[in-house]
Amino acid sequence: MKKLNICIDIDGTITDPYYWLSYANNYFNSNISENQVTSYDISKVLNIKQNDYLEFYEKFKFEIHTNQKLRPDVKDILDELYKFNNLYFVTAREKSLELVTFLYLLNHEIPFDEIYILGTHNKVPKAKDLICDIFIEDSYDNAIELSNSGFKVILIDTNYNRLPLNHNIIRAHNWMEISQIITEISIEKEAI
């Protein structure tokens, strides 16, 4: 029997959170650096109108989501976690990206039990359905919403989520730290 139900976001969580930046800099003829990405709202980062960002995203979303790079150690750690836990990918991506998402995970040999393409940032209902023990996320707003609903959240560090955390959120700087945190939570759960 598997120990924990682990929900995992995709973009910025298992993937490089700044991969889209080179596309945006080319498209908008800008020179934004990773250090300047201090907001989750990309239109705000680029200082452009939301409609201009949406036009850019519609043009490049398939290419970006097909080619984005994995964060270091993700594959090895997920391989280990999968042996003893249920891994559910829960993403706010829109339904049009369902096939791209599935193929991306398969092509990178990322193990999982299920993928949920929500088309919304409200992940609380799905976390409840999955009886989520731990949710791994990069969005500060999602982390706060999940944690306020009673879920333990591991927030993977980015330039855009460095805000105060509550008692249900643990910040991790990389996937090695995430692995250690999950091991500790798993040991605590067994002891109870």
For the regions a protein language model found, what residue spans apply to each?
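Metal-dependent phosphoesterase signature
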Residues: 40-76
